[in-house]
Design a protein with these regions (language model features):
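Predominantly the C-terminal beta-signal and adjacent terminal strand-loop region
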Residues: 482, 486-554
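Small-polar-interrupted transmembrane alpha-helices in polytopic inner-membrane proteins
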Residues: 194-215, 227, 231
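Alpha-helical transmembrane segments that form the membrane-embedded catalytic/substrate-binding core
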Residues: 180-181, 213-242
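N-terminal targeting leaders of membrane proteins
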Residues: 22-175, 181, 189, 260-375, ...
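Outer-membrane beta-barrel architecture
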Residues: 186, 310-316, 354-359, 392-398, ...
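Bacterial N-terminal signal peptides
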Residues: 8-17
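Outer-membrane beta-barrel translocator domains and adjoining extracellular loop/strand segments
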Residues: 215-216, 382-387, 421-427, 466-475, ...
């Protein structure tokens, strides 16, 4: 079963290497009518909206201008003020981004299919069942082999609907299962379906597995994390894979196809299995993005020094002229952190995205979005851990606070379903708690031009309710205690400085605390502090400040 965690971990690690392909900033957003052409098929009509367009020549650098690092600005002396030029060195011509009013909605693309992903999800679950029967033939629970399901066990599950909180390890329930859900989601999404339709497929696939894939009772926690957290993760991976493909032009080469395949295998499967049917690249509408890759060493208060590898991406940062937030996850923030540890290879996976919201502004220096966010958090320090799937109300914004200095931030508050507890000291021991999880987030980034960035990220979780298996639990008699709660707070501060080009150095400190109260058990306080020194390789947008003002250099 542990291989279910190792496999996605390896995929994510490889993803770090190919993520450098994602560079949408070299395209331009044009506010006029898109180019269309006649075609004998609907597929050609949709593809004709993407046309190769040479970039305008870069404006000569003006002497005396101190802040020419900004990624995008309005073209000076241009009749069309909707054209945004990139200040990066010119690259070979790539497809022009599609104006929002001219983009063909993904769910209206030709060759959309509901049958294909239904068959694919069923087939994938069938292959997983065969794998589990071969690799784990003698895994037992409640006197039954877990992976010996048949028509009788399936009918019993369908008839009784005896849903419980299961006893699987934390990393399986909270990390491997969401990745499984992301795979089912990706099969539907890359078949032309929209976000909500694909979410339904992921939830249906999770329900099918709970009914027919195992003999143990179906679990509430798996249905929530696999179907819903998996959908959020699947959408983020789908969007990032499509950025890689978009960077390769109208016909991505083998390297771009391979990079996208590592990020989102189901997307690559449909692109390969069905020829040109699903070759259309998702109309991302040229979002403002920021990403960086970090490699270094961490020193924890509870563990020894270990190597660490991190990747973070912000997609659809507010303030980009011409970009709109009409689709779920048109803005999201994704982060994954790993370390060289066989017992705890994944430190955290953090994802939040705007499901429904609006843009707003205040004056000429402030741009933001607000609305309903979905989030999936997985935090696993050495001594304890927490994971939640939640809905929150909040805002994300950027403000120019001085010449060349920008403040970006997010403020969210909401509630979800979570799991929290200590890290077992022995394999097979299980001590974590399920319940309702109110939570909050404050994330700030102060950007000093393209030279340095100061970051602060504070998160709080309060997990209370049922689902805590205490020391009296056994595999045949789980003791589910309704009383108890946990408060977990995590604060991360960091400073990154660019040394040369896209290369930089960073220093980071993370402080995590846990306070638990369970019935007659003594209250417990734990803390974990981690210091990291990292090498940073960043994207072409440097630290990600978005420029929308047309008189910045005047």
């Amino acid at each position: 079963m542990y291989s279910k965690t190792i496999i996605p971990f390896v995929c994510y690690s490889l993803f770090f290497v190919v993520s450098a392909y994602a560079n949408p900033d070299s395209a331009v957003i044009q506010g006029g009518q898109g180019t269309t052409g006649a075609s004998n098929s609907h597929a050609a009509e949709a593809a004709s909206a993407i046309a190769l367009q040479p970039q305008p020549p870069a404006a000569p650098e003006e002497t005396g201008i101190r802040y020419n690092w900004r990624r995008d600005k309005y073209a000076e002396n241009s009749v069309d003020t909707n054209v945004i030029l990139s200040e990066h060195p010119a690259n070979p011509p790539k497809p022009a981004a599609i104006a929002p009013e001219n983009a063909v909605p993904w769910e209206h693309m030709p060759n959309k299919s509901y049958l294909i992903p239904a068959l694919e999800v069923t087939g994938a679950l069938g292959l997983l069942s065969v794998y589990d029967r071969v690799v784990y033939p003698n895994q037992m629970q409640d006197g039954k082999k877990v992976y010996s399901s048949n028509f009788t066990s399936t009918w019993d599950h369908m008839r009784k609907q005896n849903w419980v909180f299961d006893q699987d390890p934390f990393n399986i329930n909270q990390f491997a299962h969401p990745y499984q859900g992301a795979t089912m989601y990706g099969l539907a999404r890359s078949s032309g379906l929209g976000f909500w339709e694909s979410l339904a497929y992921s939830n249906a696939g999770s329900f099918l597995w709970k009914m027919a894939g195992e003999t143990d009772p179906p679990s509430i926690n798996d249905q929530i994390t696999t179907g819903n957290a998996g959908s959020l993760l699947g959408e983020a991976l789908f969007r990032m894979a499509e950025l890689v493909l978009n960077d390769g032009g109208s016909k991505p080469d083998a390297w771009h196809e391979a990079g996208a395949a590592i990020i989102s295998p189901p997307t690559a499967f449909n692109r390969t299995a069905f020829g040109d049917r699903y070759k259309t690249i998702y109309p991302s509408l040229n979002p403002a993005t920021f990403w960086d890759f970090q490699l270094g060493s961490i020193l924890s208060s509870s563990t020894q020094t270990a190597a660490t590898m991190n990747f973070a991406m912000s997609y659809g940062l507010p303030g980009k002229p011409g970009y709109t937030y009409t689709r779920p996850m048109d803005y999201f923030d994704f982060e994954i952190s790993t370390q060289a540890s066989s017992s705890n290879p994944v430190n955290n996976v953090l994802l939040r995205g705007l499901l429904y919201g609006k843009e707003y502004h205040a004056g000429n220096d402030y741009r933001g979005i607000w609305g309903l966010y979905g989030s999936y958090d997985y935090l696993s320090p050495a001594a304890f851990r927490v994971s939640t799937t939640a809905l929150s109300l909040g805002t994300t914004a950027q403000c120019w606070v001085g010449p060349g200095i920008a403040l970006q931030g997010s403020l969210l508050g909401g509630v979800g379903f979570g799991a929290a507890g200590t890290t077992p000291v022995a394999e097979g021991e299980r001590d974590y708690h399920y319940g309702v999880a109110p939570q909050g987030l404050l994330a700030l980034r102060l950007l000093f031009g393209n030279r340095a960035a100061l970051e602060l990220d504070a998160r709080g979780y309060y997990v209370t309710g049922s689902g805590q298996f205490n020391s009296l639990s056994t595999s045949s008699n789980p003791v589910d205690s309704a009383g108890g709660s946990e408060t977990i707070i995590r604060i991360k501060s960091g400073f990154n400085v660019r040394v040369y080009g896209r290369h930089g150095l960073g220093l980071q400190y993370v402080e995590s605390t846990r306070d638990s109260q369970y019935g007659t058990q003594p209250n417990r306080h734990q803390r974990d502090g981690t210091v990291s020194i990292v090498y940073t390789f960043g994207g072409s947008s440097h630290f990600g400040a978005v420029e929308w003002r047309d008189n910045v250099n005047q």
